[in-house]
Amino acid sequence: MKNDEVKKSIIKATIEIIEKSDGDINKITARKIADKSGVALGLINYHFGSKENLIAECSREIINEKLFGLAPDKVDYMADDGLSDLERLISFARQTFDYIYSNPSIAKISIISDFKDYDPAGNSSLTQKGFQMALRGDISERKKKLIAFSLASIMQTAFLAGDNSELIIGYSLKSKEQRDIFISDVVTMLMNAITPVA
C-alpha cells in the first residue's frame, strides 16, 4: 500500500472503532486499529504521531462530514432570514445539540479530545465560529467570540454530565423538549448578559 492508502485505511478503521466505542476512549486501542486496518502497529505512530492524534483527526473528520454537512437552514448564512440574533443563535445551537445527542460516542470523544488539546482548527473552535455567524447585530467581535465560547463550553459540559444533567443543571437533556428549553434559556442568559436590554 502507498502512504496515502495506508493513512486512509487507518482513518477508516479508526472511525469504525470510534463509532462502536460508546464514547469510551479506552476501547480504542492502537492494536485494534492496526488489526482492523491491516497495517503494522508502528505505522499508526509514523503517520499520526500517536493514537490520540489519530483519534482527534478522525473525530474532526467525522464532525466536519456530518455536522457541517447539515449546517443550519441555508447556503448563504449572511442572507436576511428575518430572525433576530437571539432566535438565530438558538436555532444554530439547537441543531448542534441535537447532533451531539444523536452521535454521543463521537461527540464525547471529540469534546474530550478538544479539552485535552484546544486547537483553533478543532471541532470546538469551529463550532464557536459557526455560533459567531449567527450574531449579525451591533455586537463587537470580542463579545461575539465570548458568547460563542461560553455557549459551546456550556453545551459541552452539560452533555458530558450525561444522566446526571437533571441533578446538576436542572434539565433532563436526553429529552429533546428539555434540550430545547435549556438552549433557549442559556442563549437568552448569555445574550442578556453581554448585550443587556435597555
Task: Kindly give the residue locations of the regions a language model identified.
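Generic hydrophobic, amphipathic alpha-helix propensity
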Residues: 6-15, 33, 58-62, 66
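Helix-turn-helix
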Residues: 9, 20-53, 57
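Amphipathic alpha-helical interaction segments
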Residues: 9, 53, 91, 109, ...
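Amphipathic alpha-helical linker/stalk segments
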Residues: 58-88, 125, 132
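Amphipathic alpha-helical packing segments from all-alpha helical-bundle domains
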Residues: 67-72, 108-146, 180-184
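Hydrophobic alpha-helical connector segments
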Residues: 71-106, 141-148
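Amphipathic alpha-helical segments used for helix-helix packing
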Residues: 94-121, 162-167
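C-terminal peripheral helix-coil segments that are non-catalytic and often amphipathic
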Residues: 131-141, 154-198
